[in-house]
Amino acid sequence: VLEVPADHFDRVIDVNVKGLANILRCFLPAMVKTKKGVIVNFSSGWGRSTSPEVSGYCASKHAVEGLTASLAQELPDGMAAVALNPGIINTEMLQDCFGKEPASHYPSAEEWAKRAVPFLLQVSPRDNGHPLAVPGIPTD
């Protein structure tokens, strides 16, 4: 955090926390009115742990976890809010952190989607408030 410019830290918080809150404000009224729907908020392994050099990102994803857990308690029966740790995916961010060769051992975004979509389509109100991860995708 000492080396991170304030505007970079602010941008991470603005996107990952404030952006999420703004999207929720748009969709929740209609969902609550019908008492139906599942909200899946993308978190991260770093939303459930910490690591040096990524304190702003960790802080933002811990906020996603907390916001989602609180929202789950506020929703009416028939709805759910879950925080999803998508697992380790071969993305540009991962390549920057791990290097291209080590990152290549993890699924691409396309491979992830093929595994995640069937899982996510089964998320229901019984999962409300539970932190989730995609089965078969490494999370650490």
Where are these regions (language model features)?
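Active-site loop-to-helix junction immediately N-terminal to the catalytic Tyr of the SDR YXXXK motif
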Residues: 4, 50-58, 70
